[in-house]
Amino acid sequence: RTPFVEKGIKKIIEHSYVPVIRNSGGLGVIADEGILNISYLFPKTADSASTDHAYEKMVSLTQQAFPELQIEAYEIASSYCPGTYDLSVNGQKIAGIAQRRIKKGIAVMMYLSVNGNQTARGNLVREFYQQSLDPLRPDNSYPSVDPNSMVTLETLLERPILVNEVKER
């Protein structure tokens, strides 16, 4: 949907990433070895039918995995791929949640920033949009990404943490 997406994709490739179109979620994210992508699939029931209820299951799971952090769910508008169910600590986004309704079930997917250079990820997404959008026609449906609006679990916990350790939680 961006008029100059080829230029944006070129920028992503220059940074040694492979562009992929996701089947859920709204806007772009960066996936690398410091990011954990989690999918939570469950059957569609009367209890789980609401969109918010499905999101709340993932929020609860994440809060239980990290009781030492005050994880809240609300939109961080200056992050990349902002949404109502951004997970944040102290106003900085650590995760984004999307969902997809499937035949007899629900798939809730989360992008969780575990470790690595989150500022560089944010800068790359900002550069992607700067290259992909028409500068003469501003489009407010894309975020003006502030790389400082996002943070890793490793930074918050003030200790090294690996993706495998997060999986065990």
Predicted features along the sequence, with ranges:
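N-terminal lobe of the biotin/lipoate ligase/transferase fold
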Residues: R1-A46
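Short amphipathic alpha-helical segments
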Residues: F4, S50-M58, L162-V166
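Generic non-transmembrane alpha-helical segments
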Residues: K7-K11, H15, L61-L69, Q131, ...
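Short glycine/proline-enriched loop/turn "hinge" motifs that connect secondary-structure elements
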Residues: G28-E33, R100-K103, P143-S144
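Contiguous, small/hydrophobic- and glycine-enriched helical/loop subdomains that border
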Residues: I35-A77
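Long, positively charged amphipathic alpha-helical accessory segments at protein N-termini or as interdomain linkers
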Residues: E68-L69, K104-R169
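A contiguous pocket-lining binding segment that forms or flanks enzyme active sites
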Residues: E72-V125
